[in-house]
Amino acid sequence: MKKILVVEDDPVNQTILSDFLAANGYETLAASTGQEGITRFQKDAPDLLLVDIQLPSKSGIEVCREIKGLAQGKSTPIVLMSAVYSDHDRPSPEDQAASLADGYLTKPFDLVALLAKVRQLIGEA
């Protein structure tokens, strides 16, 4: 079973994502801070990470860069997520490129688009 690590500090969003992915056949792991996400990644070697951009301890962009800098993280897909209320909230194209992320999704979630992105990156569960 393919594993997905959800790094999200909002417990409601974390539960929605984890439950939805589990219902679609994926094993889910969770972390609530950037540092916890990095630690879980190193311990559990997930197939994909969904990482909120605004996290306690380290931003999602920092988490992405750090994981992509690890030998085991170079080929692991990472999708950044962010609430977008205005253009000011949206990461710039430069920030998105510099993060080394493999995708970007906005909140509130379009679960169909989320599942399509997951399947594009790691295939069916």
Explain the meaning of each model-derived region.
Residues A30, L55-K58:
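Residue-level signal for the "D+5" position in two-component response regulator receiver
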Residues T15-A23:
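Charged docking surfaces used in two-component/phosphorelay signaling
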Residues D110:
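Receiver (REC) domain switch/active-site region of two-component response regulators
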Residues T33-E36, S59-E62:
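Acidic catalytic/metal-coordinating carboxylates
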Residues D52, S82:
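Active-site residues of response regulator receiver
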Residues E8:
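Conserved acidic carboxylate
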Residues G25-S32, R40:
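Short hydrophobic/Thr-rich beta-strand motif most characteristic of the beta2 strand and flanking loop
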Residues E62, Y85-L105, A116:
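Alpha4 helix (beta4-alpha4-beta5 surface) of REC/receiver domains from two-component response regulators
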